[in-house]
Regions:
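PP2C/PPM-type serine/threonine phosphatase catalytic domain
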Residues: 1-256
Length: 256
């Protein structure tokens, strides 16, 4: 088995709000990966005294533990338990009902001798390569399908779309959101490799159009996860457009 993990802040003067881990149980059977992309809030109040990176570290740590310690519990239930545990850690000091309470996108994958399970919530990506080289992107595209006019202001997004029916969902303080994730299970023999990408790394495909998902996974496999992040940084330096010029970028690659 080959595993590779790269996570880099979009700004060296700011904490990385992504989280990534790979867990290989002591039994030597199976494993799991976790990628979280913390949602950077506007500069006004969030109702929480904690930072986004505090939240992603807490949630990511809980997910890393629970995905391997509860191998028979479905990933959506694992996510719900991890959200509840994280919420409990700051419920007494923070307003968890605030729409901008710390939150994150989620990618989980867990493999055993017989199956590969996955979960995707919001706009990070999981690439699945089959033995014949076919690459399938497992995505939660609800945010991407919203018209740009509906995303014109943060206030409108928070009031009408964020963790709302007809909008999109992130992992914040409500465990019920876990049921909204895109989930599935594949036979282990149908999966050769996995690559989980935060949207800062997925920009190579989604924003800059330098290749498709198969090209992206081939780049990671042949040149390494760091090469993808480096290519994204080069493109960010030369392209200007909507959104953050530089974003935290995370890649976890696993060959089964």
């Amino acid at each position: 088995m080959r595993t590779e993990l790269v996570s880099e802040s979009g700004d060296p003067d700011r904490a990385n709000e992504d989280f990534a881990s790979v867990a290989l149980p002591a039994s030597g059977r199976g494993g799991a990966l976790v990628v979280l992309d913390g949602v950077t809030p506007p500069k006004d109040a969030t109702g929480c005294r904690h930072s986004v990176h505090w939240f992603t570290a807490r949630l990511g740590g809980a997910l890393t533990e629970l995905t391997v310690s509860l191998p028979d519990v479905p990933l959506a239930d694992v996510l719900g338990r991890a959200i509840a545990r994280t919420a409990e850690a700051h419920a007494s000091t923070c307003d968890l009902s605030h729409p901008r309470t710390p939150q994150a996108t989620v990618v989980l994958a867990r493999w055993s001798a017989g199956a590969v399970e996955y979960l995707v919530l919001s706009d990070s990506a999981l690439l699945v390569e089959s033995p014949d080289g076919t690459v399938t992107a497992r995505l939660d595209d609800r945010l991407a399908r919203l018209p740009r006019s509906a995303r014109a202001t943060d206030a409108h997004i928070d009031a009408r779309l964020r963790n709302k029916e007809g909008g999109f969902f992130t992992a914040a303080a409500d465990p019920a959101v876990a049921a909204r994730a895109v989930t599935g299970t594949l036979p282990r023999e149908e999966v050769r490799a996995l690559a989980a990408l935060s949207d800062g790394a997925a920009r190579w495909v989604e924003r800059f159009g330098r290749g498709d998902w198969a090209d992206c996974l081939a780049l990671i496999r042949e040149e390494g996860a760091g090469a993808l992040v480096e290519r994204v940084r080069e493109l960010e330096r030369t392209h200007r457009g909507r959104g953050k010029r530089h974003d935290d970028a995370t890649v976890v690659y696993v060959e089964l």
